[in-house]
Amino acid sequence: MASPMEAYAFVVSAGVFGLLFASFLFWEVSKIKVTRRGDGYSLLAADVRHHTADRLFEIYSAIQEGARAFLLAEYTLCFAFIIVFGAIITVLTSYVNKPDQTFDWTAGALTATAFAVGGLTSMVAGYLGMMVAVYSNARTTVSAMKEGARGWIESFNTAFRAGGVMGFGLTSLALLVLFILIKAFETQYPLATHSKQLFEAIAGYGLGGSSIALFGRVGGGIYTKAADVGADLAGKVVENIPEDDPRNPATIADNVGDNVGDVAGMGSDLFGSLAEATCATLVISTQSTEIIAAGWPAVLFPLVITATGIFVSAACTFLATHVWVVKAEKDVETVLKVQIFSSTALMTALVVPVAYWLLPAEFVIAGVYHCTPIRAFYCVAVGLWGGCVVGFVTEYFTSHSYHPVREVAQACETGAATNIIYGLALGYKSAIVPITVISIAVYVGFSTAGMYGVALAALGFLGTLATSLAIDVYGPICDNAGGIAEMAELPAEGFAIGSAALVSLALFGGFVTRIEETTINILSPITFAGLFMGAMLPYWFTAMTMKSVGVAAMEMVKEVKRQFATIPGLLEGLPGHGPPDHAKCIKISTDASLREMIPPGLLVILSPIITGTFFGVHAVSGLLVGALTSGVQLAISQSNTGGAWDNAKKYVEKGCVSIEDKEGKLIVQGKGSAIHKAAVIGDTVGDPLKDTSGPALNILMKLMAIISLVFGDFFKSINGGRGLLNIPLDTVAAAAPVVPTH
């Protein structure tokens, strides 16, 4: 078994290595220069005119400025939130209501400190990731200008390396900061005697990360879709001009939104997932006297899983950039699949020796589940491969390389209504396999090691986070690069939801561990009522976010139409026409997102606090289970429906859909056709589903659970967990079925 120093060295070395590797990838991207008048090596392509180089630089600068301005405004509000909510955490988590002590200010202060550190770390990771993405967008465009296979190789490598900067930087930063926080808190709460208090305080770190992710996902999602939907409606549908046309005043805001929502928001989301899964595992591990007795090597097992994933992801990165290279469009999906499969396989092989290296030969969780290192490996492995399967299934239902999306595209032949009907059906159907996979992971983890096994399965889902995040960020960078190319007149989300579901369940395990409940009676009236209320919350949340996008999009359409009407020659594209006012559109998106993200945020944050305060811990248990079971289904169906509509539109734009004319000849239906307009309507409806409401439901599931975990002792201290209304914890016959939590 490893010594404490060996475990420390492995975690720290992985974190430092990950940051250095992220720096190396950024250095590779920075070799491509984007300058005016083609001064840089990047603009030496023979067909690039000087005015095009200038235009490229201007667009890149405008996107960079807009992204920085939005994030500054959003993070100013987030910083104020950290201060205010941190004070609330300090007071409420200090309240213990014991005969000999009313407040434990040490516990409250440490929890609030962990919360602030988690929030600030998430903000730093999101900001750096977004700025790297903005930095890389134009460079990806430039790389794609090269002819033939060279253009594909260099553009793919540029975007993939930029995604890697985000993936390795975020994962390593989360790991290092959490480890430093644990060792700092140990001075107040020694592991051997105060392990429970130590990791309950550390749980604030996950709460901080997830709180910022809420504002990043909701605010960023509203920003990007207000601009995107507004640009599409005013441009392609109303005025019949192409997507990302430089005449459209909303295009810069649209491209800023790709970075704000799809990069910064997603990065904060997955940062929160990693922090929460790790914190939940640490809290639940205190139920095993053998793990605590074995010391830091066994306790740090969840951190070492993440550390191992950093090394594995780094090794597999070179497969995509140097071994299976992208030489044509058809190679992209294959290379990304190889990347996912190879990293998952290598990670699976390495978890076995890691488990035997760190964990005791036998240990018991909650006095019930007898575990061994190989059983712990099974839990991690089912999460690893579950994430892989969910990713592939999501691709099947959202890529136009496969039948489901092509079927949706063909449905556009009879109009937008059938397109929407087919898309909704696809989204609902796409939830079947992911939910089955998640259920299997939960069953294997729970039956093997109780809630500790479920938490390990969640960590398995996130085991190769650096690789998964690199691939996720690759998409928005390429999307943005394509938008820049079209504006410069050059030639023309499943994993996160699956991990969020398992993380939420792991946090639920941490919550019931903290409130020291051995069973939750699902037929207890208060628990059953809480379950129904929890199942309703994702729908309420979706209604809020969808309407917010609609309100902001209407403002954007009116502004774009005003500019087309008042700026001479803009719509017609006449020589010497006045420039569109991009700043006005950026301001509309910024103001709308900051204004509209507050009500959904309050709904998520206050729901468990109010429920626990007034109705007690069993009502909270029902609330969390209800929100999880309905939220994960809704998130998958919304995200995949929107993704299918998006790719059905792209399939039509590629000229892959044809209809017969009166003479029986096939006529290609590309851009500008009636079929294309129907596809655009579906894509526009799906935009807020796949980029705002669907992804933000991840945060709803996780944030409600981590809030309940952090405030668990406070809820328990109010009338013994019965709440201010003093509701009995169990008022049903003894024969009623119960859900074991240990």
Named regions from a protein language model:
Residues 1-742:
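Hydrophobic packing and interface segments
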